[in-house]
Amino acid sequence: SSQPLSAMLLASPSFPFPVRLETYGKGVSRGYFQMSLEIAKICGSKNHSSSGEINIVPWEVSLPDSIEMPTEDSLIPIAMLISELHGAKLELNTEPSTSPAINRLIKKSSSIDLRDESDLICPASVLMAIGNGGKISGAAHSRGKESNRVESTLYLLRCFGMDAKATSDGLEIPGNQSP
C-alpha cells in the first residue's frame, strides 16, 4: 500500500540514517506513492524507487515558492452520482492524468480494476448498480483498509435497497437497481 511508503518518505528528512525497504507482491495505490515521491523531489529529495525496493535517505527540505497539487480524482464519482441521481448537469474536463478507473466509470464500462484506487469502490458500485451493472476487480486489498471496504460497500448498498455479490477481489453488481 502507498500510505506507509509515503509516510516513510515524507518523514525521512529527520531520519538519522538511510533505510532500505523491500517490497513484495503486487503494489496497490501506486499513484499516491508516485505523487508523494514527486512532491518530495520538488522539495529537495533525491530518493527514488525501483521494482522491489525503495532506498530512502535523509534529505534537506528546500521548499519552492509553490507546489501544484493534482486534483483529487476520487471525488469525480461523487459528482457523477449527484448528476445521475438528481439530474444535475455535470461537465467533466478530464486530463490525460485522469486515472484509468475514473475514465472507465465515465464511459460506463462494465468492468473496473481498482488495484490503484480502492477509494472508489463505494461510489463506483453505486454508479454500476443504478446503471447497467458490472464487475469491480483488483480490490481485495481494500478489505484491509480503515474498514473492510468490500463488506462496508455491500452494507451501504443494502441500506439503500440495492445489492451486489462479494468476489475474491471485488464485487459483482447487478444493474438497473433503484435506491
Where are these regions (language model features)?
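Short, structured segments at the rim of ligand-binding sites
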Residues: S1-P179
